[in-house]
Amino acid sequence: MAILKSALVGFICFLHFFIVNASDNKSLLTEDIMASQVCNGMFAKKGKTSEITLKIDSYTSDFGGAIRLLIFNWKDVNAIGMEDDDGEKHYICNYEDIEAGVCKDDDYGLYLINQTAPHDSIYSAAVDAESMVSPLKYPVEQSGLYCVFTAPLEGSSEAYKITVTWENYFGNLDATDYPHLFLNPILLAINCLIGIWWSFIMFRYRHDLLQVQKYISGVVALSIVCTMVSTGYFYFANSKGYTTGSKVFAFFLSLAQSARQSYFGFLLLIVSLGYSIVVPSLGSLLRKCQILAGLQFVSSCFFLSSLFISPSNKESLVILFAAPVFLITLFAMFLWIVLALNNTIRDLRIRKQTVKAQMYTRLWIVICFGIVAYASIVAANAILIGIYGQMNYYLKYWKLLWFLNYGYTDILVLILMLTILYLWRPTENNRRFAMSEQVAQDVDEFEMTSSLSNDSLHLHHERPTSPANPHIIHGSADEHQALFAVDDESDDDASTLATSKQKPA
């Protein structure tokens, strides 16, 4: 059970890699050695105020002691600690160090600072928690990675809780989320331009639209809504902080992201099954696709909303329940898409429908490119963490985390969506190629989760154009555009369309 729980938590952390949500700009420190230190990026700007605020929430001590405190920019880390005559480095002044001459009586209990080493950001002091009425403020004058180290002055006799607030000059967002304020509006503008372009060609060829193209319009609309809500969320969180209003905003953002992700997967699935292009109707298979997408949407909503509202609570029961369901549905949909697309391409090639096979081959290339591109950034992160270690990786690349964690993924998804829209865009050839006798008569032959037998391939083949049969279309320059074989207005009249005759071009 413990292994399963660890695996689920690990999977949640992996999903957290590409989930776009804001990190709280507050950290909680306690006397526990594993929770007494924290580091975070900070941005500074001339004429603007950035500061680190420490507020003691609770404190208990048997001896009325104090809390040793150290705040510094990581670039000055080499100045922390003093070496004795044997070259051994000491970080906290104790009685042995005083006797050895490493530090003075006034330094007892404090973090030691090498005054001969260059530094300009280190603050070391013993804080009397009981007399500390107002929060301690540390001014940030240079952009960098800042750390706050604490420890009980009297050891295990003291217990405390300290809230550290990282207040950047631009607002309440964490430093790693700051690029959202620029990236999201750009993505929103691009998605709106894509929406205008798609609406124009949909209106231009409104009499030749296929049902699958109407489904594609839903992806465009959801992308605009998702980027709009995401932009509003981060601007609201930056302005108002992580309040109840921010959590409500985050909940709607989780709904939008879940809807876009599930719908996009559903669209890829029905396209891979040949809907509107190879077969006029999916029959009961369409309902199965909708059920799978619905399960993924519900589990994703629970999962994302829990992470948005409580980002630090990765082991809650809701997350531990929703994560495996989300994983199963995500894997099932991906596997189904791959199998369906592979079988569709194979069937089209067997039937010598080269133009359609080329369209689906291009879609396969786009999907493979997306998988390889995303896997590359995940692998690059894993390699860098393996080389530098998690802490040093963060210390070295914290300014690039916005790109590695979400910027790269957002840009990649936008490119993939735009490519698929271009391949499946409406054209004047929709009606022309609608009745080309390339439609399979048996929908069950496209149950892509099962193997295709040779006996199931006795379908209509494309025939070359001849004077005796001018109604059959074969090979033209227009075939290299985005071609659609079926003008499918609905599943109900699909069989009628499949048996209709095409007018001479």
UniProtKB/Swiss-Prot annotation:
Gene Ontology CC terms: cytoplasm; cytosol; Golgi apparatus; membrane
Subcellular location: Membrane
Secretion signal, residue range per the UniProt entry: 1-22
Keywords: Glycoprotein, Membrane, Signal, Transmembrane, Transmembrane helix
Main location: membrane
Transmembrane feature ranges: 181-201, 216-236, 266-286, 291-311, 318-338, 365-385, 400-420
An annotated GO BP: retrograde transport, endosome to Golgi
Entries under Pfam families matching the protein: GOST_TM, PTM1-like_N
Glycan attachment sites: N25, N114, N342, N454
Protein's UniProt name: Uncharacterized protein C26H5.07c
Species annotation: Schizosaccharomyces pombe (strain 972 / ATCC 24843)
